[in-house]
Amino acid sequence: GALSGPVIGGILTIVGFGSFGKHLFNCMPIMVGATFMSYITEHTTQEPAILIAILFSTTLAPIAGRYGTLVGIIAGAIHLTLVVNVGFLHGGVNLYNNGFAGGLVAGMMVPILEAIHVHRVARLNPQRPEVDPAEEVETLS
């Protein structure tokens, strides 16, 4: 697609958040999933709105960093699907679309993934004491 102002802004946003732990290995699975979803739907990566959505989908990079590449690809695909379908809620403003869609994806996936992760860790390491995720959250506050 064209290298326009919003696309450059998206690239600079990714670079800026690099100081907070966003890097190639947790951004690429998300972007691959979003790009894959754009190819199997009627949207093309030449559209500026889709390019911006793919760039801002890296808001889900912590999910790929914690739960792995496959989960990151799935999160990116779900993110792009939501971005193109929730635009009517706030007049098509892409930044709001991406933030809202990222929040929905994280809100849906993280509790499920955390429950699976806790049980998987307990199964792989039987000597480790059982941990309740709710108690872990309570101790953080």
Tell where the protein language model's regions lie, with residue ranges:
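Pore-lining transmembrane helices
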Residues: 1-121, 133-138
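Transmembrane helical cores of multi-pass ion-transport proteins
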Residues: 129-130
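Catalytic phosphate/metal-binding cores of nucleic-acid and nucleotide-processing enzymes, i.e., regions
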Residues: 125
